[in-house]
Amino acid sequence: MSSEHIQNKLALLPDQPGCYLMKDRQGTIIYVGKAKVLKNRVRSYFSGTHDSKTQRLVQEIVDFEYIVTSSNVEALLLEINLIKKHDPRFNIRLKDDKTYPFIKITNERHPRLIITRQVKKDKGKYFGPYPNVYAANEVKRILDRLYPLRKCSTLPNKVCLYYHLGQCLAPCVFDVEASKYKEMQDEIVAFLNGGYKTVKNDLMKKMQVAAENMEFEKAGEFRDQINAIETTMEKQKMTMNDFVDRDVFGYAIDKGWMCVQVFFIRQGKLIERDVSQFPFYNDADEDFLTFIGQFYQKANHIPPKEIYLPDDVDSEAVQAVVPDTKIIVPQRGNKKELVKLAYKNAKIALNEKFMLLERNEERTVGAVERLGEAMGIPTPSRVEAFDNSNIHGTDPVSAMVTFLDGKPSKNDYRKYKIKTVEGPDDYATMREVIRRRYWRVLKERLPMPDLILIDGGKGQIDSAKDVLINELGLDIPVAGLAKDDKHRTSQLLFGDPLEIVPLERNSQEFYLLQRMQDEVHRFAITFHRQLRSKTGFQSILDGIPGVGPGRKKKLLKHFGSMKKLKEASVEEIKEAGVPMNVAEEVHKHITTFNEKAKNTEQK
């Protein structure tokens, strides 16, 4: 659609609440929003300046629709449903549910007490969430001892162990009145809603009576139940003392991002929290409302008895989303402090996010920029690094890794089997791989690097530059990475003539070069080992006097693997059925081969 088309539609927007749907060139809905005044909100996207994320959204908008509603509350409810239906990519996307465990009383003729992570609309009674399965199991264990509900998923034809333990009424054999189940369910509900203190007091009275009647075994059982209640139900620090289930919301905003923290308070205890961070495009309080609406659409987020909100939120709109929950905007006291605590945690989480982003920027993009400055070249956003690997001239390979803005781009990694070089000639190997790589770059019009890094010194650098300039006509900066006697990145060589680029050893740009050199070395060695594992046995035994195809097969059959042959003594090799002089030659050859391999891998 043309900008004229959008301007014409903007002129027709009403001064009423409603929802708007932004569309891209394919007609896909990419963003859904709500507004108290549609005209003001939608026009704001196409006028004035915006931050980068909002600008990205606006750049993709080629058309929009709107739906007028009778109130802001109705707009919120409609927005939630539209987001659920269309899943626009620029809207808040709540992370996948963290499925908390719940205790459930099943809706069956003979109900069971189970632990589940799935909350369904099946008329069962759900209690929770609990912070983990262990906590839920602890509570269920107490309930199983106190209330003998059915344990088996299907009724057997005879009583089981639970009946003999007093933890099941055995409905498989005996008739159990529905009123008995209702009584137990009511007591379980009361227990989980803070009434366990009443249960504990009743048990203490029963324990005293049993002790007075000399029924010490029964008194001991009551004592164990009391101890279980004390250790399980009373070990957490109380947040509130009225045992009401609550969700406490707080949010913070910074640099176009919002963090929402939700504290789950169950039975007076703060048991868990949910943290969500996302960019927002609307007014902060409006997007926060949308978040709450989406939050309680998740199956495992059961609205509690009460919800605490910050004082800048439209509580009437939230009430429409969760009509059976009491919405409270605390003004003072402990309740207000809980909301402040949720806000404080949200602010800390956002600060940490941006600090981590800054640190990551410092060690990647920032390091690349400073590396370019130190070398006197434009910022090398794309760096391609090369390393060769061979052992005694066998299976020579080369590898290339690519870093984009200081980060590995593994889709752009390449590995090469060397085709034209005989023996361990590092310079010729470098010439071949540079020729193959950049001939293809030219042919297929692939992205050119801003810098080529060679794992080596003057000889390797000159070989690479000669191919680039004199054969391919390319002028790409080439630098070399030298190592010290401990095989660690030591110097960056660059220029004509070559000079050491002065870099602080503890600088991020030096660390970046280390990561590049280590990564290309790892990639080359891994590729070389893969080839050696396929051809190693054959190639190591090639050229040994007295070892032809028949004896190679005999050695392989006897030892089973190259690893075992490498570890074998002369006598053990002789036991494979070869003469002593041949066994000595094989052992000598393998020992020499292993020493050279070790030295090459340390390169």
Swiss-Prot record:
GO biological process: nucleotide-excision repair; SOS response
Keywords attached to this entry: Cytoplasm, DNA damage, DNA excision, DNA repair, Excision nuclease, SOS response
Molecular function GO labels: DNA binding; excinuclease ABC activity
Keyword DNA repair in record: yes
Keyword Repeat applies: no
Chief place of localization: cytoplasm
Record Pfam families: GIY-YIG, HHH_2, UVR, UvrC_RNaseH, UvrC_RNaseH_dom
GO cellular component, one term: excinuclease repair complex
Domain GIY-YIG: 15-92
Cellular compartment(s): Cytoplasm
Domain UVR: 197-232
Summary of the function given for this chain in its UniProt record: The UvrABC repair system catalyzes the recognition and processing of DNA lesions. UvrC both incises the 5' and 3' sides of the lesion. The N-terminal half is responsible for the 3' incision and the C-terminal half is responsible for the 5' incision.
Family: Belongs to the UvrC family.
Subunit structure: Interacts with UvrB in an incision complex.
PANTHER family: UVRABC SYSTEM PROTEIN C, UVRC/OXIDOREDUCTASE
Name this polypeptide is given: UvrABC system protein C
